[in-house]
Curated annotation (Swiss-Prot):
SUPFAM superfamilies: L9 N-domain-like, Ribosomal protein L9 C-domain. The lineage of its organism: Bacteria, Pseudomonadati, Chlamydiota, Chlamydiia, Parachlamydiales. It comes from Protochlamydia amoebophila (strain UWE25). Gene3D superfamilies: Ribosomal protein L9, C-terminal domain, Ribosomal protein L9, N-terminal domain. The gene is rplI. The keyword Manganese does not apply. This is Large ribosomal subunit protein bL9. It holds the Pfam family Ribosomal_L9_N. GO terms for cellular component: ribonucleoprotein complex; ribosome. GO terms for molecular function: rRNA binding; structural constituent of ribosome. InterPro entries: Ribosomal_bL9, Ribosomal_bL9/RNase_H1_N, Ribosomal_bL9_bac/chp, Ribosomal_bL9_C, Ribosomal_bL9_C_sf, Ribosomal_bL9_N, Ribosomal_bL9_N_sf. Binds to the 23S rRNA. Keywords: Ribonucleoprotein, Ribosomal protein, RNA-binding, rRNA-binding.
Length: 161
């Protein structure tokens, strides 16, 4: 096992400033070339204190920012119009990338695809409850209403009446 000091947060491994034990191949082929970690020795212990202090400051700022974004997203309902065949089955599916674009267009919030928790692409019409996982463990729930073009036109006509 190789002992490394993480310079940046690594998903499912640790936060910056932590010393972790990883297999040599993972260190040699991924963490070290991408500058995500350095080999832990006496000199890096001083770096560890500085990294921990920076991480704590960044964590506080990230949590505030994430909570503000979560308040905007929480309870929001977005509408995605899709094409369907005569039996009501969708052509294709609604993907995470499309959901991210919907949120950007509707709420002017920049998210990454990894923030949306979706196990499988959405392949049915109706209302789907989704979760956004933001930094520092902050989550927000919102609804995605997938409608056929015909159903969307009908709902617009009902709103006008």
């Amino acid at each position: 096992m190789a002992q490394l000091l993480l310079i940046k947060d690594v998903e499912a491994l640790g936060r910056s400033g932590e010393i972790v034990n990883v297999k040599p191949g993972f260190a040699r082929n991924f963490l070290l070339p991408q500058s995500l970690a350095v080999i832990a020795d006496k000199n890096t212990l001083r770096m560890q204190e500085r990294l921990k202090a920076e991480r704590e400051k960044r964590a506080i700022a990230d949590k505030k920012e994430s909570e503000a974004v979560a308040m905007q997203i929480e309870g929001m309902t977005l509408v995605q119009v899709v094409k369907v065949d005569q039996e009501g089955h969708m052509y294709g599916s609604v993907t995470v990338a499309e959901i991210v674009h919907l949120i950007q267009d509707h709420a002017k919030i920049e998210l990454e695809k990894k923030d949306i928790q979706l196990k499988h692409p959405i392949k049915t019409t109706g209302v789907h409850s989704l979760v956004v996982k933001l930094k520092e463990g902050v989550t927000a729930n919102f609804n995605l209403k997938v409608m056929s073009e015909e159903g969307y036109r009908t709902s617009l006509e009902e709103q006008k009446a």
